[in-house]
Swiss-Prot record:
UniProt organism field: Oryza sativa subsp. japonica
Catalytic activity: ITP + H2O = IMP + diphosphate + H(+); dITP + H2O = dIMP + diphosphate + H(+); XTP + H2O = XMP + diphosphate + H(+)
Residues reported to bind ITP: 20-25, 60, 76-77, 93, 152-155, 175, 180-181
GO terms under cellular component: cytoplasm
Binding sites annotated in the UniProt record for Mg(2+): 48
Full protein name: Inosine triphosphate pyrophosphatase
InterPro entries attached to this UniProt entry: ITPase (IPR027502), ITPase-like_fam (IPR029001), RdgB/HAM1 (IPR002637)
Amino acid sequence: MSGAAAAAARALPKAVTFVTGNAKKLEEVRAILGSSIPFQSLKLDLPELQGEPEDISKEKARMAASQVNGPVLVEDTCLCFNALKGLPGPYIKWFLEKTGHEGLNNLLLAYEDKSAFAMCIFSLALGPGEEPMTFVGKTAGKIVPARGPADFGWDPVFQPDGFDQTYAEMPKSVKNQISHRGKALALVKEHFAAANYKVQNDGSA
């Protein structure tokens, strides 16, 4: 493992670009990463892809690295209903836009099984032509009628196992410790600590 980490050590031409146009998501990522990884954020118009979640995330990272001409971190989030064999999955954003929180609950009306899991996939591409690395976090829970502030996606309808609160009702510090995003970013932080990347650009560009 140490040999692999040493082999991965390299200089990055500039800080990692986290690709997002979602202010709430950016706020959460900044809270979780703190100053552990130097990154900047940028909204890019990447095409919406279909396929398996990890494949989608990797392909987005390849496209983003080509556009940015540098290292990028992209995120894809899934909400998977076990009764529906994993749907809505990576298409949760569109399901939520079309049906709202009540509609997500209605998808499971005919099923006793309300269990679900939230999955977050971060893909890191160190530059154009580089094969992306993926970091996956999962949190199991269940789908419930919406509770809590409705300002961050499907948080009000997802109640993680072992808790009486939905994501939306939780203090941010608690959610960030147990969430799918928090778990995936913990793996990203581990990778950066082991790889010991050095950013060449001091930010003057």
